[in-house]
From Swiss-Prot:
Cross-referenced InterPro entries: Aminotrans_II_pyridoxalP_BS, Aminotransferase_I/II_large, HisP_aminotrans, PyrdxlP-dep_Trfase, PyrdxlP-dep_Trfase_major, PyrdxlP-dep_Trfase_small
Keyword set, alphabetical order: Amino-acid biosynthesis, Aminotransferase, Histidine biosynthesis, Pyridoxal phosphate, Transferase
Residues carrying N6-(pyridoxal phosphate)lysine: K217
Gene name tied to this protein: hisC
Protein name in the entry: Histidinol-phosphate aminotransferase
Cofactor: pyridoxal 5'-phosphate
Species annotation: Citrobacter koseri (strain ATCC BAA-895 / CDC 4225-83 / SGSC4696)
Length: 359
């Protein structure tokens, strides 16, 4: 066979995959820091002891203890819960289950979480965007104009990276607008920091509502990769058709079940109270620093702030081993950096470094 006609392995890949820009996760961005404040992780580890030793057997697809414990915690029925490899897998499952590649679309409202677009582009589903209003609330009129052909809409509340809650009345309007035509997904990865705002109680009113959750943030288990999809049973049954046979390993299911016991949930709430105190300390300090132009209100475990010369500030802290998340490329976030709320020692490192910046 002539080598002139031989295509490279890359040429054999799907065109949309060749053109794809992978999600820039905190670890993928690299860096040699010792103060990691760019992934909204909990700053200290939580210890568990494995109780399941049956590693010679395949795990359950949906481990009973995990499902039942999460249902109890979230106030829903076990049949309304699906567990997956992080909420990111939930995003992908929803697109695969509801969107016809090349024909239908998802919609989301930037600035927001980047995995909605990455998952849709990987699968070959059109991605539509309607930027938020100046206050980062939903542009309902703009959404209405773009809904034709949309099967799944993602709304992150509290929103990453801006930190604010989406107006609940706007969410109700959106749910009425999409009834019978599209699934509305409320991404509640950070809801433990403002639990009163959850939409889980709305599932009985809206058959097309889906809520995404995770153990990565307030439960301090980012390394576990364990997330949840809350929805009506009709939706859950569809997702069970497309999920992998064994999404959770036995050790992951073991630790997740322990984290979701009443004792585990109480420990999580104590951690949240600690983070909220630390958040206020950091906010108060940031407001007094010369290079900080604005500190935005947050309902989460991170703070978005606008800086003078943000790129040089970001690099300066990076060089000192303090890794933040640069948000300059997101719509309406020029000059903005996102700072995870860490320990008091980590907060002080950030504060001292920023105070030393020459502006």
């Amino acid at each position: 066979m002539s080598t002139e006609n031989t295509r490279s392995v890359t040429d054999l890949a799907r065109e949309n995959v060749r053109n794809l820009t992978p999600y820039q996760s905190a670890r993928r961005l690299g860096g040699n820091g010792d103060v990691w404040l760019n992934a909204n992780e909990f700053p200290t580890t939580v210890e568990f002891q494995l109780t399941q030793q049956t590693l010679n057997r395949y795990p359950e697809c949906q481990p009973k203890a995990v499902i039942e414990n999460y249902a109890q915690y979230a106030g829903v029925n076990p049949g309304q819960v699906l567990v997956s490899r992080g909420a990111d897998e939930g995003i992908e499952l929803l697109i695969r289950a509801f969107c016809e590649p090349g024909k239908e679309a998802i919609l989301y409202c930037p600035p927001t979480y980047g995995m909605y677009s990455v998952s849709s582009e990987t699968i070959g589903v059109e991605c539509r965007t309607v930027p938020t209003l100046e206050n980062w609330q939903l542009d309902l009129r703009g959404i209405a104009d773009k809904l034709d052909g949309v099967k799944v809409m993602f709304v992150c509340s509290p929103n990453n990276p801006t930190g604010q809650l989406i107006n609940p009345q706007d969410l109700r309007t959106l749910l009425e607008m999409t009834r019978g035509n599209a699934i509305v997904v409320a991404d509640e990865a950070y809801i433990e920091f403002c639990p009163q705002a959850t939409l889980a109680g709305w599932l009985s009113e809206y058959p097309h509502l889906v809520v995404l959750r995770t153990l990565s943030k307030a439960f301090a288990l980012a390394g576990l990769r364990c997330g949840f999809t809350l929805a009506n049973e009709e939706v859950i049954n569809l997702l069970l058709k497309v999920i992998a046979p064994y999404p959770l390993s036995t050790p992951v299911a073991d630790i997740a079940a322990q984290a979701l016991t009443p004792q585990g949930v109480n420990a999580m709430r104590e951690r949240v109270a600690q983070i909220l105190l630390e958040r206020q300390y950091l906010v108060n300090a940031l407001k007094e620093i010369a290079c900080v132009e604005q500190v935005f209100d947050s309902e989460t475990n991170y703070i978005l702030a606008r800086f003078t010369a943000s790129s040089s500030v970001f690099k300066s802290l990076w060089d000192q081993g303090i890794i933040l998340r640069d948000q300059n490329k997101q719509p309406s976030l020029s000059g903005c950096l996102r700072i995870t709320v860490g320990t008091r020692e980590e907060s002080q490192r950030v504060i001292d470094a920023l105070r030393a910046e020459q502006v």
